[in-house]
């Protein structure tokens, strides 16, 4: 299921970031950072009534030759292209400007639903000054005050009315939904073509469940797969290549619809910060993951070359220590068959359930080997553990005091559960909950 995307667009200094922070609230502050994940704040999750959505903050668009204006405008165009609904923000204090009218022209061309928000209406008297904005042609303007939080409810009511009904998933539960993600030029398109051209792969293109996405169904060794949004992976264009922050929104949609993610890195260039950022999206969505080192044919090899590279991957992607690593050459079609067992294993483990009785035996043994921590004379007591979800496997551990469950001990319990049950290829979530 994909969450709708809402983009906040407008000229500089109309209060876009303030509204963004108001909508996402505490979600922007990270309670427990995952080590090694680079966080990118241009998008976050929002929630209104029963609706979950992703919301994007964009740079200010204006007329003239301001620094970076060409890039900012290009980024905004990508955000508009990927958005399902657009909040067009203007500022009542400065009135209607030429830059507002230029942004309006961009939005007309997009043919997307637009909700017009007039910000900085900080007192009732200022409501009389919003009428000029009707001339923009987007219907009723919504008066809001980002600094005081006024009018946001009415604005969000108008936004969620434009959300479309989620289309039913057309694929069987047994079909593995697969996405290939990575920064530009690591060989994603080549890998798509190589997989679909592999012996014993039977291919058929189908319309995806999201706008302008094309999925590709194929089967290999009696397992059905669907490669999510192959058109998006093959989508070219300098705007998308040069606006990585915003073009990643397309990858987000594909990630949300997938069970298993192939994260592609370039063996020639090694691992850079952007690789970790892209991987962080998939990890935070709780997806099963396989790391694919592409262009392996270009690397000069000695006896331990693969081991050294694998050690480097483990060091840089510490938060993906559960993911298997495959070394391939999409261009030369080398070692592709090593991928399929990893994908299948990751998918099966992503859906794995364990019996509560066996789970509690493992937890009891873990505590006997490494007693629970204490803080100011109080010891953590673990009463019971149970699995509450799959995709990813999620466990609740009932304790006497949640504050006593340190991150390090939670990590220890996860490692013991992994040692007992496997779970290669999938994240495992452990939630501490106070026993009533």
UniProtKB/Swiss-Prot annotation:
Keywords: GTP-binding, Nucleotide-binding, Repeat, Ribosome biogenesis. Residues 352-436 form the KH-like domain. CDD domains: EngA1, EngA2. The keyword Ribosomal protein does not apply. Residues 4-167, 176-351 form the EngA-type G domain. GO terms for molecular function: GTP binding; ribosome binding. GTP 1 binds at residues 10-17, 57-61, 119-122. It comes from the Bacteria. SUPFAM superfamilies: P-loop containing nucleoside triphosphate hydrolases (SSF52540). GO terms for biological process: ribosome biogenesis. InterPro entries: G_ENGA, GTP-bd, GTPase_Der, KH_dom-like, KH_dom-like_a/b, P-loop_NTPase, Small_GTP-bd. GTP 2 binds at residues 182-189, 229-233, 294-297. Belongs to the TRAFAC class TrmE-Era-EngA-EngB-Septin-like GTPase superfamily. EngA (Der) GTPase family. GTPase that plays an essential role in the late steps of ribosome biogenesis. Associates with the 50S ribosomal subunit. This is GTPase Der. The lineage of its organism: Bacteria, Bacillati, Bacillota, Bacilli, Bacillales.
